[in-house]
């Protein structure tokens, strides 16, 4: 089906794309400074309306910086009252398309209301929502990024005409991509959103009708133009050779196998030395190696060879664990280096890439949440649409692949659909077939190499049993290990998270409707259990009320320690927590009492259900819900006590503050409480390093002042005898290839993006070299980047 016909059957042969530039984000109090509307007929531009508007208020320098529209430019422009009738006439009854159509629609409605005009009820389409859904794996969804993705110029973006033109063109591309999907997916999404009035609803309906009419079941109306290559989390290589047939020289040497078989492979003598040291570390009964290997040495290939060699005795030694800090390195190791090395050597290997279980989608929980869309608001519905599309393609179930979901900033929804300890059990999730995390856990026990991140490795320290029994660990990017250790041994208390944990076990919550209906069936024949459930509902309400009061009072008592005018708030350390919380002690005591009541009632419910179903075969869902709820509320109670009482001298306590709804009448300070072990090194030594026979810690930067002492002390290796230390310089000629410049002028420029930008431009013109400029402020970086683009 060609484009013209597709638009016709979807009732989009005529549509109008719109975009407004405004003095701010508030549709009631801010004003429009530029409008653009472009008419499309059969996918071709036929007419346009573009007009600067005098808002009769001053345009801030911030808005001028974004749009390029100055007060001088709009001084002689017509006011909104002078253009509104012509603009509304131009819009007519056509469907309206916008990028985040809610923004433009709200400004249009307020404009009409303010000037006493009726507005035609248009069918609305949103390219932002569509892009998040059908391009769910793209990293960015702003108009400029999407324009470049589809090959349209983004020059002049944030001016209404350019943005409107690109919105219309992008919309057509997105329609074609959406129409490439089969009826099952399109109908599923339509059924999910049909009860709420949201943009693109009619598009899903029209595509479904046309697919039905055409009798297409497994294919779409058109073919997709997108080629997707989705990541995997398991890698198998059958391999005919034994790894014992190779050594470092035959693999990495100047006449070695990698040199012969891999394009652009460079012989590096230190790579061979590094590889031999790793093999020596893993051959000893007990050995820990700390090796600094400069960038470009080829350390990942070298330690992967060591891991494959070490794992050849998998039955006796278990798998080799490889841990790194960044996702980029994980992807490089698993999707590039490991396959390349094992296939080139043709050796057998079974490898798995594992993340913490909350990174994975639980199909059961997702089905429960989406089966009753009435419990979700419009924003929730739109945020979840990308998940439906991503599920058609994912091979891993790793939610981080679905950027479209996270782009909506409804991250709390992740906690409603991710795999959950104590909930995602075989008895529940087996019904959904191919449970992502459960399937991966089974593969772990067959793998001889397991790639994880530092965070999961530290979770294993605190709660052994996530990984199979193993004796050998390789830690790359080891300079970041201590940060992950602090994060693991840290306690956080926020009102939002605490409320979520309490609501999770609330039978009266709309999101508990599915399991609550099962509970109601049991209660109808069990008056005693019914009474306990009512007591639980009452206790949960009291806990939520006391939580709100407690956090408000903590915020009020500590308001003076924070400043709403500051971008970055202080994080005051609490030297005496009993004194800090003395004034709100009654609130804390009440919160403690309510949490204990909930735990006691959950215990009674668990006991009652077990008496009815002692084989756990009939009400598996309820068993899991209340067991998990008991663990979560108990953990919440423990955190509250740790943070507000019984101060530990080996722990640092602090609070953080964030001003919500800034610069509005509803502005408020939200406080969160935190605690962390001051020095996790002792814990690391006892519960981590002492557990294993062989450990390699490596990175490009481990030494401080040419010594490993600081690093060894921080990670708990200072007093261990079996630590081997070695460093290798980078093979790059930094002194010849790179020069470092630091500004030391008398004028302070660190927060002045124009002066920084001019300095960068001058240096670029002087040296005529590629440059890397380092910033510590994202805001300054962004503003400087814009300034350079506009002035270079």
Please give the residue ranges for each predicted region.
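Acidic two-metal-ion nuclease catalytic site recognized across multiple nuclease folds
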Residues: 1-10, 173-250
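Conserved non-catalytic scaffold segment of RNase H-like nuclease domains
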Residues: 1-123, 136-158
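A substrate-engagement module of RecA-like helicase motors
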Residues: 230-235, 248-256, 314-448, 510, ...
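Conserved pre-motif I regulatory segment
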Residues: 242-291
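Walker A/P-loop
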Residues: 284-305
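Signature of the SF2 helicase/ATPase Hel1-core->accessory helical subdomain module
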Residues: 303, 331, 421-449, 453-593, ...
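A contiguous, basic/glycine-rich beta-loop/short-helix subdomain that forms a polymer-engagement track
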Residues: 415-448, 458-464, 598-744, 751, ...
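Conserved helicase motor "Helicase C" RecA-like lobe of SF1/SF2 P-loop NTPases
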Residues: 776-792
């Amino acid at each position: 089906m060609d484009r013209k016909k597709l638009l016709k059957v979807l009732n989009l042969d005529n549509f109008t794309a719109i975009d407004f530039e405004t003095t701010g984000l508030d549709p009631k109090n801010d004003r429009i400074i530029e409008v653009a509307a472009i008419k499309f007929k059969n996918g071709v531009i036929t007419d346009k309306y573009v007009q600067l508007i005098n808002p009769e208020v001053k345009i801030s320098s911030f808005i001028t910086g974004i749009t390029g529209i100055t007060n001088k430019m709009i001084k002689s422009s017509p006011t909104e009252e002078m253009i509104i009738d012509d603009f509304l006439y131009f819009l007519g009854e056509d469907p309206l398309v916008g990028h985040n159509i809610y923004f433009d629609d709200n400004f249009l409605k307020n404009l009409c209301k303010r000037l006493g005009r009726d507005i035609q009820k248009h069918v609305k389409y949103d390219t932002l929502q569509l892009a998040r859904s059908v391009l769910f794996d793209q990293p960015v969804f702003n108009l400029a990024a999407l324009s470049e993705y589809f090959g349209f110029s983004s020059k002049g973006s944030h001016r209404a005409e350019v943005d409107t033109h690109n919105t219309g063109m992008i919309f057509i591309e997105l329609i074609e991509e959406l129409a490439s999907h089969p009826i099952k997916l399109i109908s599923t999404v339509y059924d999910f959103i049909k009860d709420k009035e949201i943009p693109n609803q009619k598009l899903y309906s029209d595509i479904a009708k046309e697919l039905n009419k055409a009798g297409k079941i497994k294919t779409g109306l058109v073919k997709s133009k997108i080629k997707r290559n989705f990541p995997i989390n398991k890698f198998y290589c059958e391999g005919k050779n034994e790894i014992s047939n190779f050594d470092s020289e035959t693999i990495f040497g100047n006449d070695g196998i990698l040199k012969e078989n891999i394009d652009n492979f460079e012989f590096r003598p230190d790579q061979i030395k590094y590889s031999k040291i790793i093999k020596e570390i893993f051959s000893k009964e007990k050995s820990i190696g700390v090796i600094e290997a400069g960038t470009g040495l080829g350390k990942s290939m070298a330690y992967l060879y060591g891991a494959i060699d070490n794992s050849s005795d998998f039955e006796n030694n278990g798998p080799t664990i490889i841990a790194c800090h960044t996702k980029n390195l994980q992807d490089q190791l698993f999707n590039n280096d490991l396959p390349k090395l094992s296939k080139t050597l043709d050796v057998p290997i079974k490898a798995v890439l594992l993340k913490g279980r909350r990174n994975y989608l639980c199909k059961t929980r997702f089905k429960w949440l989406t089966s009753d869309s009435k419990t979700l608001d419009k924003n929730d519905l739109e945020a979840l649409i990308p998940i439906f599309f991503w599920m058609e393609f994912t091979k891993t179930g790793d939610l981080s692949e679905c950027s479209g979901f996270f782009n909506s900033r409804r991250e709390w929804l992740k906690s409603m659909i991710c795999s959950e300890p104590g909930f995602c059990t075989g008895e529940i999730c087996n019904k959904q077939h191919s449970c992502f995390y459960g399937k991966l856990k089974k593969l772990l026990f067959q793998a001889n190499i397991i790639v994880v991140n530092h965070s999961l490795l530290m979770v294993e320290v605190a709660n052994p049993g996530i990984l199979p029994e193993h004796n050998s660990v390789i830690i790359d990017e080891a300079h970041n290990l201590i940060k992950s250790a602090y994060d693991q041994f840290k306690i956080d208390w926020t009102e939002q998270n605490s409320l979520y944990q309490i609501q999770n076990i609330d039978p009266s919550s709309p999101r508990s409707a599915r399991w609550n209906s099962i509970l109601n069936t049991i209660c109808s024949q069990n008056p005693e259990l019914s009474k306990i459930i009512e007591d639980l509902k009452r206790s949960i309400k009291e806990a939520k009320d006391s939580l709100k009061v407690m956090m408000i009072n903590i915020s009020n008592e500590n308001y003076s320690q924070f400043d709403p005018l500051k971008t970055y708030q202080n994080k005051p350390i609490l030297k005496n927590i009993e004194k800090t919380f003395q004034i709100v002690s009654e609130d804390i005591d009440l919160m403690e009492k309510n949490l204990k009541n909930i735990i006691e009632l959950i215990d009674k419910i668990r006991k009652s259900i077990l008496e009815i179903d002692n084989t756990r075969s009939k009400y598996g869902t309820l068993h899991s819900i209340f067991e998990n709820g008991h663990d979560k509320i108990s953990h919440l109670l423990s955190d509250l006590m740790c943070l507000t009482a019984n101060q530990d001298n080996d722990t640092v306590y602090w609070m953080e503050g964030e001003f919500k709804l800034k610069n509005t009448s509803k502005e408020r300070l939200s406080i969160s409480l935190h605690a962390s072990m001051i020095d996790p090194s002792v814990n690391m030594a006892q519960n981590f390093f002492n557990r294993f026979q062989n450990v390699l810690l490596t990175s490009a930067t481990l030494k401080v002042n040419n010594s490993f002492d600081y690093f060894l002390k921080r990670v708990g290796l200072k007093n261990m005898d079996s630590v081997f230390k070695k460093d290798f310089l980078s093979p790059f000629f930094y002194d010849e290839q790179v020069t470092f410049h630091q500004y030391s002028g008398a004028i302070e420029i660190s927060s002045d993006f124009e002066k920084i930008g001019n300095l960068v431009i001058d240096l670029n013109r002087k040296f005529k070299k590629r440059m890397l400029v380092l910033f510590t402020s994202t805001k300054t970086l962004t503003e400087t980047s814009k300034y350079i683009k506009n002035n270079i």
